[in-house]
């Protein structure tokens, strides 16, 4: 009985020691635009993998963000709260880049601040140490290249964007327009190289999958002769059932390539949509890699080590000639 009691005491002591160790860990925070977006869950999985491989580290990776991707003010408040509470470093994917930068400027934190997935506007980049994520301008370039192969003579096009103030989305749109027009600094396609944006476009999803699918349906109805629909981000495809219903209405056009769809990202529902013929090309980011690499980048910054700026995580391009990443993922 005595030995059993001693064993219980030892187990309790071990648990308390483990809890104390967890409490003493320093926090590396990753704040995303919204927990409702499956893209960001991949960043979380990368963060969790880092945790599983670094159990003895003095640091822990914390993934957080507002419940909804539409809650820009909520994201700013979360960053504010974390900096007030005290974290060792923070990586932010700003939904509203100017608003987030303004708050960072006001707080003037002494800890390392970096951006992940989405950057601050160019004028505000001195507020962060580095950016880790996609070369978003290049992503737009790649999407344009796919469109040019599929529609060499050009045509009518609609761009679907996310949040009006999201720097990453705007950079992709710029890369697309510059490349497909053959001109720099094009705000809207009006016949350059045969491409014109239809009335009512671009459309902004505010990162909402249901709205994204409704917008697609409305644009298809209003523009029976539309040549290309470009999902600059994956929003509509994040709701696969709704996306299937929308694309069912134009499946004959998709098969004949009278209408082409090119979409950003390569999450599992999206690669399935591609294999099902519901898009002609996917240009994918690597969010898992972002979440996995971010803690080590933050630790380097804490230690005063030199870190490249930016740190690009690469792209995966899928098309009918080379299914690539989309073939089996």
Where are these regions (language model features)?
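Bacterial N-terminal signal peptides that target proteins for export
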Residues: 1-8
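Bacterial N-terminal signal peptides
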Residues: 8-14
């Amino acid at each position: 009985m005595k030995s059993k009691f001693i064993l219980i005491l030892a187990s309790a002591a071990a648990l308390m020691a483990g809890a104390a160790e967890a409490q003493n860990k320093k926090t590396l925070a990753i704040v995303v635009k919204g927990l409702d977006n499956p893209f960001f869950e991949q960043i979380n999985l990368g963060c969790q993998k880092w945790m599983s491989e670094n159990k003895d580290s003095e640091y822990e990776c914390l993934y957080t963000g507002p419940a909804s991707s539409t809650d820009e003010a909520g994201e700013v408040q979360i960053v504010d709260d974390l900096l007030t509470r005290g974290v060792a470093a923070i990586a932010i994917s700003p939904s509203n880049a100017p608003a987030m930068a303004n708050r960072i400027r006001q707080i003037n934190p002494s800890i390392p601040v970096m951006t992940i997935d989405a950057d601050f506007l160019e004028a505000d980049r001195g507020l962060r140490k580095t950016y880790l994520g996609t070369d978003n301008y290049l992503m737009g370039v790649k999407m344009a290249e796919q469109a040019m192969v599929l529609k060499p003579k050009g045509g009518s096009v609609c761009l679907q964007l996310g949040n009006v103030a999201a720097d990453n989305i705007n950079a992709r749109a710029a890369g697309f327009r510059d490349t497909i027009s053959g001109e720099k600094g094009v705000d809207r396609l009006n016949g350059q190289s045969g491409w014109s944006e239809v009335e009512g476009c671009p459309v902004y999803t505010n990162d909402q999958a249901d709205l994204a699918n409704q917008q697609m349906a409305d644009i298809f109805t209003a523009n029976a002769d539309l040549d290309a629909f470009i999902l600059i981000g994956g929003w509509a495809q994040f709701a696969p059932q709704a996306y299937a219903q929308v694309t069912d209405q134009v499946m004959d056009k998709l098969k004949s390539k009278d209408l082409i769809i090119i979409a950003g990202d390569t999450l599992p529902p999206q690669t399935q949509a591609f294999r099902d013929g519901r898009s002609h090309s996917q240009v994918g980011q690597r969010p898992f890699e972002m979440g996995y690499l971010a803690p080590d980048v933050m630790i380097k910054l804490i230690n005063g080590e030199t870190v490249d700026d930016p740190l690009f995580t690469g792209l995966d391009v899928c098309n009918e000639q080379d299914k690539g990443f989309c073939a089996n993922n």
